[in-house]
Every structure is written in structure tokens, then in C-alpha cells.
């Protein structure tokens, strides 16, 4: 049969039919009768449209050959043979321009003269049986049905055959010829008997063997077979049934299922108030590094030694001054704390042997900054349960904050490439089985795309800081330990480089439970002037500590160097997750893999190489107010990685809630885009549960703003 199809039909039709079958995971070499049926249906649809035009007076005419310059418009728009996404785009466009109602299923043609969609049917059975099945499935007055059989019979809605006698005769003759050709090769009987009831290629494929047994075993109670259950589901009318079930539950429960239309959803309401502030545990785009290349000093690799070496590369230190005070803090204490760190580093250098770790003096400024002796005294409950007015202390409601532009800039920066490589090839793990050859190839391609990404720098910085802080918290519980913030990378030329971002001073850390908090003071170098976006730096006291000479296209320029100081806190569980930030690489790699898999299953071969090496192809990255943003595959990799990294850096209950609840609304919108006619109840309640997570978190507010852009463009 496969040979017959390839000989009998136009190669373009054969190619389209193969593509359609592969899109739904069916093999033309195995499902040969279905292959023949799809080719036949396509050919009839194309013949239906051939030679039919509308002239400038709006009259329908037949032109088999003639003046190529005549102002003629095709009478029929062909929808059959296009891939699903494009076909729905064409249907939507027709509906928008003509005002015709949108069909539930993809039709085959649109008739511009009669202003209606047409569903073509080709059957090996009785035409009236097939017609009833089609009509029952489509359930639409809008779509005109026209059925042809291989015996020369036809049937159409209201006996309106649309085309002239001669055009229809041409189709019937072609069908009769196909039947004769099949019969002469002994293929007709098998082809005729293989037609089952009305179905679309995506709705039915045979389940056999183990999968069939599993399907029969996993049916809900009271169903004897899979067919039985399918028939029930196909005829299921959700509205009344679900309402009936709800009415049995309680008199208070009342849910009316409302259709979810393009006009139904509204944008999420973002909170007002002062702009949101930076709340990450370390600086991101504003960080400045003091670096040494090809480190080979004594004690190289010991953080304190590396930090001292990096500090010595800078010569522009000056008397520190406060340029942006912290609103609520004692700013002079932050200034004194930095002076103390500088003094203690100089003390270390004067010692004969530099120690591996440095515990610094518990001065009054550090005790204040680290909250020493500030925790309320704990009293055993048994000692105070008789106190009459015992109550939990009042906590303030969180203050609402509005979205600020800096968080979008932070995200854009995280997606960019740096001039250093932050991970080696083996950061994601090694092969353990031969099947993983493709996995290795994907991993290597992916690593090449993201190794220089700024988000990858944030991963390595986060892993280092959290590991060092957790180690110090366990090893020196009572001490105020000085912890350098360090990262390592390779330059373009492959030279090793050690970077110092600043210092952390750890407070007392008797961490018994996962959620017990250790306080720390962070002091980070930066060239960003805090007075440009003071709202971003609400939690910081910023000092000016030096002047840095920078090489620019116009020569050397001097820029002030700042130190961003703040009190912060973390816990064992947060540090544990911070140490595992490399998981972000794995998560984004898996997302890319699922894109490759989708492409590979359509093409029936592994598309990894083409996917990464076809530099001309662009992919959707996300929604912005301008519409769908597209970029290279590298940009997609880096954007997915940056999202994963920001989910880790800005992890919070607000993010958890927003992600879980907004996903429900997203799925409903996707269902609407896929023409699945979703219904909802208590949509207001869903909006409430999403919007109660929009309080003050910058990353959540940015995601909500992206979600609104998506809603705008998805429902156009």
C-alpha cells in the first residue's frame, strides 16, 4: 500500500500526509491504510478548490487557464494540509475579518463566496452514515459538510452541493480511479474494511498489548472496557453534571460553570506604594570585583590569602564617608565596621604566618550590626502558662510595594554574556551509560551557550558564599568570623582568575533547627552610585571608600568606588539550597531538552546538532509589552537559566504562592488558545489567591507584570 500511495499521489500531498501523521506520532510505513486515506482526503480538498475564483464583481467563476493578470481572488481558502498552529491562525484570521463563528474543530476549506467553512468527508462506507457521524461530531450550524464516496455518491448539508456538476464529477472520477487502482493490486478490500467511525487523526490511535491491558485495569469503577469509557467521556456534558455533584455536597457550595472567553480575563492588579527594594543576599549587576590573574601566591586557594592578594591590587583607597545612609540604622556603626575590617586585614599581613581563618574583635559596632544580645529571652512555657494576658506579640502587616524598573534591568543583565567562563564542562555531571552519548552532546552544547553567562557567575558566587557561611556557622559558632566573598573563573585566553567581591562578617550561629537564623553583615564593592536609584538601596548603608581608574575609549577616567553595607540573615535550610544552586543549570538544561525532544519526534531523528548549530533560526523567549520576544537558541538557554537562578536568589513564600496559583490561570488561557472551550467557576477566587501574593517582592512583581503582557498578547 505504501508504494501505491507514493506512486498514485502527488509528492507534495504525500509529504504533507507524512508530516501530519508524524505530528501525532503515527508511522506512515505501518498505518498504510490511514496514510492512503489522508492522502485521498487532501487531494479531494485541493481538487474542490482548484480553478474556482471570484472576479472583481464578486462573482464566482471557473478559470482553468487564462489571463494571469486578471484581478481574481481564490474562492476557497485551503486549511487542510497546514500544520495545526498555522491552520488555527488562518481560521482565527478568517473569523476576525469576516465575523463568522469560530469552529470547534479544524475545517478543511473556507468559501469566500458563501462565507462559510466547509468540512470535506471521503468515505468507504454509506455516505449518509458518515454524514451523520460528521454532523454529530461538529455540532455546528456554521460549518457546511460535503461527503463523497468511492462509489460516486455524495451528500451535503441541506443538499447544497456548493460546486457545479462538472467540478464534482471530476472529484468522483478521481475517487473511482483510486478505487480501481487499489482493486487491481488487491488493496481495496483491506482499505475499505479499515475505515472505522468518524474520527480525527489526533483523537484515535489503536492501543494494543501491555498498554491496552493497563488501560483496561485502570478504568474508573462501573466501566467494563476502554470503548465504554471513551463513549461516556465523548458524550459527557460537564455543566449540569458537576453542578449536580456540587449540590450534593452542601447547601453553601454553589458553582456555576461560566465559559472562559477572550474577554473574560482581566490583568492582575499590581500593588501601589513606594518602589520595591533589592533583597538578594549579595549584589548582582552592581557588584565590583578586585581580581588577580594566574594566582600563584603562597597559600593560593585559601580564601583569606586570596582576599588579601586581591585587596593589594587596588591602590585608590581613601578615608571612607557615608554617601547614602540607612534610614533606620546607626550608620556610624557601619562606617566603623568597615574601618575595623581594613585594620584587621592589615594586622593579618603583619603577622609572621597568615592564619587560614580570621575571627574579628567583638566591638560595639559589630555587636549592634549583628544583633548580639538583641534576641528576646526565651522562657519555658511551663513557667509562664499561668500568666493571664500571655499572647503572641503583634507583628506588622507587610507594606505594599510597587514594581520598579531596576528588577527588569537586573534580569536583562543576568541573561548577558560576560568575558569569562564560570563553569567547566563537568559541572553538570558525567555519563554513566552508553545511552547518555546524546545527553553528553546536549550537555556540552548547552554548557557552551551558558558558561559565559552572568547568571552562571551568580550561581558560582552563591554556591561559594553559602558554602563558606555554612561551614563557618558550624565551625565557629560563637565567633564573629570574617569571610571573603570569592569566585573563580577563566579568561578568554584560558587563564585562571580569582575575584573578590567584598566580605561577610558572621554573627553568633548556634543553629539547632533548619530555620534558626544566623545574622551577618555584608560589605560589597561597587561602582554604582546609590543616589541614582535610592529606593533600590533602602536596606543598605553605602560608603564611598576609594577612587578607581578605569580604561575607556577616551583614556583613563577616575570613578568613585562604593561599599554597600547591610545587616542580613539566613538559615541552615537556605544555605543548603544556596549551596545547591548548580541545580539551576540542570533545570534549564532539561527545559531545553524537552524543546529538542519535541522537534526530534516530529522529524523522527535526533535534532540536537541542528537545534544548536542552525544560527539563523529564532525561538520565542517571552512576552513583553512589544509582543513575543524572539532570539537565538543561546539566548533561550541563557534566559531560561536566568529565570531559574532568580527563582533561587529571590525564593520566597510570595513566589511559591504566585507560581502555583498563576499556573492555574495560565493553563486555562492555554486551553482557550487551543480552542478547548474551557469553563471556570469562582474565577474571582483564583484572582484573589494570585493577587494576595503580590505584596512587595521585586521578582514576583516582575513575573506578574510579564504575566499581564502574556494575557494581552495571548488573547488578541
Curated annotation (Swiss-Prot):
Gene Ontology biological process terms from the UniProt entry: cap snatching; DNA-templated transcription; symbiont-mediated suppression of host gene expression; symbiont-mediated suppression of host mRNA transcription via inhibition of RNA polymerase II activity; viral RNA genome replication; viral translational frameshifting
Motif mapping: Nuclear localization signal 2 (NLS2): 184-247
EC number(s) given by UniProt: 3.1.-.-
Cofactor binding, note field: Binds 2 manganese ions per subunit.
PTM entry text: Phosphorylated on serines and threonines by host kinases, including human casein kinase II.
Subcellular location: Host cytoplasm; Host nucleus
Keyword Membrane in record: no
Residues forming coiled coils: none
GO MF entry, a single one: metal ion binding
Family under the similarity heading: Belongs to the influenza viruses PA family.
Protein name (record): Polymerase acidic protein
Gene source species: Influenza A virus (strain A/Swine/Iowa/15/1930 H1N1)
Lineage, top ranks: Viruses, Riboviria, Orthornavirae, Negarnaviricota, Polyploviricotina
